[in-house]
Amino acid sequence: MNTIVPFSHPMYIMLKPAGSLCNLRCKYCYYLEKSKLYDDNKNHVITDALLEKFIKEYIEAQTTPQVLFTWHGGETLMRPISFYRRALELQRYYARGRQIDNSIQTNGILLNDEWCRFFKENNFLVGVSIDGPQEFHDEYRRNAMGKPSFHQVMKGIDLLNKHGVEWNALAVVNDFNADYPLDFYHFFKEIGCRYIQFTPIVERIVKRTDGLTLAPGMQEGGELTDFSVTAEQWGNFLCTIFDEWVHHDVGEYYIQLFDATLANWVGVAPGICTMAKECGHAGVMEYNGDVYSCDHFVYPEHKLGNLSQHTIYEMMNSDRQKDFSKMKYRLLPQQCKECKYQFACHGECPKNRFIRDCYGNPGLNYLCKGYHQFFHHVAPYMDFMKNELENQRPPANVMNQVFGK
C-alpha cells in the first residue's frame, strides 16, 4: 500500500469521526462492537470544538514538516462532505507552513461524483475495503439486511478512477478466500489497483464484563472464529502471490507486506507497525475524544485518556503508551528470540500472539507457522533485492534472475 510514513517521532493518531457507525455489517469486523463502549450516547459524531482541538494539537505535536491525517471508521463517509471541508479549513488555519496530507478509509458504498471530486481536488489518498472478486467479497461483506455489497463497491471504484483519485485496496484474507490467492491477486490487477494491503483476519470469542466479545491480544483462551484464516492458509497465500509478483510485477504493483519485508531485510523501518520491533506509534481517537493505544486494542484497559483532559502529546508519550510499545519486544517468547527470521516480523501484531511456543511459553503468534514459511520462501529473493538496493540498482532486477528451489 502506498502509505505515507513521514514521522521521525512516533506521533500518529487514527481519527474515527463517526466512531463505529457503519452501513455494512461485515461478519468479521472487529470494530462494530465498539459501540457497546458508548451505549450512553447514540449520537456517535465528533463535535466541531473537539475536531478543532484535535487538529490543532495533532499538528503541534509533530516533529516533521509533513503531517498525515488518517480518517477511519466505522464508515467515514457517513459524515457529510461539509464535515471534511471544515476539517481542511482547520488544517489550513493551524498548519503554520507544514504540509498537510489526508488519507481516508471507506467501504466505497457511498462514493459518488461529489465525493470523488472532493477527494481529487484536495489530494486525498483513498483506501477502499474490497475482498477480491464478487464471490469472495460478498461472502462476509454484507449490509444489515444481509444483501451483498460488491457491485456498489465496484461502482465506487469506477468513480474514483473516473475522477483520477489515488486509491489503494485493503483486502481481508479469511478462511474462505485464502485458498484462492491467484484469483485474488489477478482481480486487483484487472481493476488497475497497484497498491494492495492484504490483512489476515484472526479473531477469538471471549466473555467480557464490558459487553465486548472479541478477545484482545497477548491473552490466551477464547474460541477461534470460523472466518479466521489458518497459519497454513496464510503462508500458502503469501508464497503463491509472491511467486507471481517477484517474476512479473516488482516495481509495477506494490504489496504492503512484501515492501515491509524488504525494508526489514535491508534494515530500515518497515512503515507498518505490525512488522516493526516496537508498536504503539499509531493511536486511535474515538468520536468523543477517547484515545486508545491502537486500533486493535480499543478496550477500556488500553484507554490512554480523553482529549478534554489531556493533550495528544501527553497521552501518546505517557508511560502507559511507552509500556504498550515495548510490550511487543519484551514479551517475545523464546522460540521467537531463537528464530532466524525474528528481524523480519518481530513477532507480528501482539493482537495475534495468543498461542504457546515449542517450549510451552505464552505469546507466540497464531500465524507464526505461515510467516516462517513465507520468510523461508522469499529469503533468496530478498537477499538479491537487498544487494541491488545497497548498490543503488533497482530491486526490480530480481525479475531477471532465476533461483533454484
In which residue ranges do the predicted regions lie?
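Short, ordered coil/turn segments that flank beta-strands lining enzyme active or ligand-binding pockets
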Residues: 287
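Disulfide-bonded cysteines in secreted/extracellular proteins and peptides
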Residues: 22, 26-29, 273, 279, ...
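Radical SAM enzyme [4Fe-4S]-AdoMet core and its adjacent flexible, acidic
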Residues: 143-151, 158, 162-274, 278, ...
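Long, charge-rich, low-complexity alpha-helical segments
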Residues: 1-5, 186, 338
